[in-house]
Regions:
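Short S/T/G/P-rich N-terminal loop/turn motif that feeds into the first structured element of a domain
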Residues: 1-101
Length: 101
């Protein structure tokens, strides 16, 4: 059974935050997110490192990973350093079957 997961991504960019945010907030990005039923909740920039970005999404389990796989090349053209991407996943509750391999 698929359930909603909140995913927190951090990564580095090779541009300014304003340049990156303009792309993230674009109609094209909205369209690509909606194709995977992804709802962006927050995006921001580190106060300590202007190249470090955080993005928080909510989507059905596995959809954000599918989005990154399908759109990695597009993301890289917007100067996202995919090699720095880190993810954590969060949910409102867990059953024993959902947790901990």
């Amino acid at each position: 059974m698929s359930f909603s997961v909140t995913s927190v991504f951090t990564f580095k960019i090779e541009s300014t935050f304003d340049e990156w945010a303009a792309i993230f907030d674009s109609a094209e990005a909205d369209k690509r997110h909606s194709e995977f039923d992804i709802k962006p909740l927050f995006r921001g920039v580190s106060k300590e490192d202007p190249q470090k970005i955080i993005v928080i999404h909510q989507a059905p389990e596995g959809n954000v990973q599918k989005f990154v796989e399908a759109n990695g090349d597009w993301m890289a053209t917007h100067r996202v350093d995919l090699s720095t991407m880190e993810e954590t996943s969060w949910t409102a509750s867990l059953t024993k079957d959902d947790c901990c391999d």
